[in-house]
């Protein structure tokens, strides 16, 4: 009996001996699913229907239970239901509007769920009627636009956004959702911008608005002109762009906070004790306990903003106090059902409150810092496809930032120094860096730290080649800017050089296994050319002459790695095979590195012999280097400071299609009109006649 009740919707028992009675709304739904026009026997049928509390489960279930032939028999009634839902949105009676919005959601979901194989045009015909579709959808979008932009209830606005999210995500592939053509024609872009630019509405609806915008931008973006892409690319209104940045910033901040909380819990707990007892063999297990589900929807919104809108770059650098989200009492905001577990957006009132006490010693932050911290967490673990994609998206965003002139200017600005506490993967051979020891530096140092951290920590069997290539490209783009603008950055360059040499060492040690899956010569060439950049132009951007000397010291100290690399690429390039050409490019690229090694090594050996020293100190090697620069001959290499600019299509199109599909499925799973309790809504509007 309990099973029957669940299936039939909300049922009411009169007594244990009598059959349970169906509630009135369920009986009215049943009438719609009969062939006859329900108004035949009840002229006020539609008026009454929208005064009834919606039974979403029953209505969706009923739609899903029909096969194609059965559906076509009641198509006129379904079209009529859709039409009256749209009409009800213009009613002054708020309860009718609430019920109409929820009914529309059930219609969109139910019809699509049952007819997954049907074409978009068939779906439109079943749901709206093809001849009336343009008019009905225009009316629907205008009503939603009015509700979102009006001074009405915040709950209604929330419901409108949830309906739109429901509509956008009913198909697995967003670009196959033909109904969205009407959302393109009847744009709600301005309504979304209005929400983002207003402090109050942003705090309540910002998250859903940003996710909705990110999805709409990806509708048929490669096949046709998408008006949301065009409009987003030209937004120059500061409050709107700030609002967009604020929503993204807070979603990422909340993720970082949750991760930090979990990390602190674990440090004082069982895994910490166990690790200290038996070494670090359990670190991987302990680390997995820290995983908080990543938030690709917000990351996609950040990507689209950075990629499409040059004005948004300024938002990345806007400073504001860094507030401990856990310690600050926040006005509770209902968790957005589109938010995955672990990414509930915090109250945006925290940053919007002008009365916040500003402590002069308070660390300042900005969206870029928050994003770098987020990336440092996400990029730690790339073992599964989901996290790998998250890390890839972070690196794509950083690629767009690294090749933007304005972004590079503030990244390297000596007057904008920040202390950025990146998360570092637990490793046996290194201690955890104390946060307070991190100096205030230009932001580019944090970006380089993040790249070095990734290079050092992902040399493993399941080698993420694509991420490594992107990482090295980001470093290259930053160095190109430094060379071009003669920026002498005070950075621990030795850590970068050491990480890159160890990467080459790893490629050599795992040549056979890696070559079965990857073109390792492409990555090796990029790394060698980074060294060529330092060798050829280092005197124009390294901070001091001694930094340039240290570069030579590192190359000489680790000469065995470069010698082995040369032997390997020479062997491969002299044999016929698929890697002949890429290997020969590395051979040519090594000319200056080999010249340095072959020039200085005999001089160092001679110095040691003359002075009867078995092992030279670093200072002694540096002395030999400085005294013998004048006799060193290097070859001028062209194109070292050139790079291919990022382009989404065609290279990244497949990645973004799959990413949007994954986000869409997640939003569909989490968007639920029942989470915004009907009882709460109806109670809110019960006094409105």
From Swiss-Prot:
It comes from Danio rerio. Signal peptide: none annotated. Its main location: Golgi. PANTHER family: ARMADILLO-LIKE HELICAL DOMAIN-CONTAINING PROTEIN 3. GO terms for biological process: regulation of Golgi organization. It is found in: Golgi apparatus membrane; Cytoplasm. The chain crosses the membrane at residues 520-538. It holds the Pfam family ARMH3_C. GO terms for cellular component: cytosol; Golgi membrane. The lineage of its organism: Eukaryota, Metazoa, Chordata, Craniata, Vertebrata. This is Armadillo-like helical domain-containing protein 3.
